[in-house]
Amino acid sequence: MDIDQYMTDLGRRARHASRAMARASTAAKNAALDAVARAIERDAQALKDANARDVARAREKGLDAAFVDRLTLSDKALKTMVEGLRQVASLADPIGEIGNLKFRPSGIQVGQMRVPLGVIGIIYESRPNVTIDAAALCLKSGNATILRGGSEALESNAALAKLIGEGLEAAGLPQDAVQVVATADRAAVGKLITMTEYVDVIVPRGGKSLIERLINEARVPMIKHLDGICHVYVDDRADLAKALTVCDNAKTHRYGTCNTMETLLVASGIAAKLLPRLGKLYRDKQVELRVDAAARAVLADAGVGPLVDATEEDWHTEYLAPVLAIKVVDGLDAAIEHINHYGSHHTDAIVTEDHDRAMRFLREVDSASVMVNASTRFADGFEFGLGAEIGISNDKLHARGPVGLEGLTSLKYVVLGHGEGRQ
C-alpha cells in the first residue's frame, strides 16, 4: 500500500464530505446516530467476534492485562456505546446558532454563527469505544472525521467503521464523513498530522509518548493535553471535613485518569490538624506518600508511615497510580507559585472558607479548570454538563478544558444589512 497516496485520498474524500456535513440537518444527523446504535445492537456478536481476534493477538504479544481490558468489547462496553450514541443525538445541535447579534450605528446587524471546524483527525490507542465516541461527536457537530485507532484494535475498528458507514448511508449522509484508517503502518499517522490542505485539526487521545511525538511532528493544529499534574491546595481557612472529602476523592476515586490529584499542597497553619487524619486515610487505601520535610515531620509524629522523601522530580510527575506527593507551603502565595511552576495547566483546586482567597486562586492559577471546595475529578465533560467530551485541552487557543460539541465548532461573523454602504 502506498501510504502517502492512501492518506491523501482519505483526506480528499473527507474534505468533500465535510461540505455536505456542514449543511446537514439536525434530523439527518440524529437519524444517522440512531441507525448506528441500532446496527451495533443488531450486530453485537459480529463485533465481539472481530474484537476477540484483536484480543487474542494482543495476548499472544504479551500485552498486559490492563491493556487487554481497554481493548475488550464486552456486552457492557457495547451497551455503553449505544447509550452514548443516543445521548449525543439528544444534545442540542450547536450548528447554525447566531449569537451576540448587535445593531451598529451604520444600520447593520453583526453577530456570530457557530459552524463546524471541517475535517477532524482523531488519533487514539487501544480503546475501540473511542471510534464510536469520536465519530458521534464529530458527526453531530457537522464535521467529517478521519479516525486512526491503535494497531491492536484494527479488526474491531474496521467492524465498527462498517456499521457507521451503514448508519450514514441510511440517513442520506456521505459515508466518507467518517473514515477509519485501515492500516497499522505508523507512517499513516505521520501523513495525517501534516495534511494541512485536508485536515483542520487533530485530536490525539493517548499516552505521553504519542502526544510528544505529535507536538514535535504535527503541522495541523491540535486540541490536546500532555500531562494531568493536578493539585489540591488546602488553605489554613479550610473546613476540615470538606478538605478530607475533597482530598480523598481527588486522589482515590480513580488513579489512572488525567484529572486525578497528583500533588497535595497544605498550608502550614492547618498541616498539624489535617495531615495526620488524611495520612491515615491514604495509608488505609495503600497510597504511597512522597513527602517534603515539613510533611514528614507531621506525619511521622502521628505514626503515619511508611513515607518516601519527595524529590524535585515528584513535583513534575503525573503518577496515574496510588502515589501522592505532599508539600507543606507557607500560604496562598506559595501555593499559587508552586502550581503555576510545576503544574500542567489542567485542573487545580483550593479548599478554603475565605471568599477573597478563593477568588484570587481562581484568577491567578493558570489552568483550564480551577475549582473551589470541589474535587479535581469533576473536570469532565459529562460533569460540566457538556453531555459528552472528545478529550480535555490544557492549551489556551480555541478550546480549553473538557471539549464537547461546542469545542468542535468555530464562529464566523455574519452581517445582516438593508443595502447599507460604509461611509
Curated annotation (Swiss-Prot):
It catalyses: L-glutamate 5-semialdehyde + phosphate + NADP(+) = L-glutamyl 5-phosphate + NADPH + H(+). Its EC number is 1.2.1.41. GO terms for biological process: L-proline biosynthetic process. It is found in: Cytoplasm. CDD domains: ALDH_F18-19_ProA-GPR. Keywords: Amino-acid biosynthesis, Cytoplasm, NADP, Oxidoreductase, Proline biosynthesis. GO terms for cellular component: cytoplasm. Gene3D superfamilies: Aldehyde Dehydrogenase, Chain A, domain 1, Aldehyde Dehydrogenase, Chain A, domain 2. GO terms for molecular function: glutamate-5-semialdehyde dehydrogenase activity; NADP binding. The keyword Phosphoprotein does not apply. Pathway: Amino-acid biosynthesis; L-proline biosynthesis; L-glutamate 5-semialdehyde from L-glutamate: step 2/2. It comes from the Bacteria. Belongs to the gamma-glutamyl phosphate reductase family. PANTHER family: DELTA-1-PYRROLINE-5-CARBOXYLATE SYNTHASE, GLUTAMATE SEMIALDEHYDE DEHYDROGENASE. Catalyzes the NADPH-dependent reduction of L-glutamate 5-phosphate into L-glutamate 5-semialdehyde and phosphate. The product spontaneously undergoes cyclization to form 1-pyrroline-5-carboxylate. NCBIfam families: PRK00197.1, proA. This is Gamma-glutamyl phosphate reductase. The gene is proA.
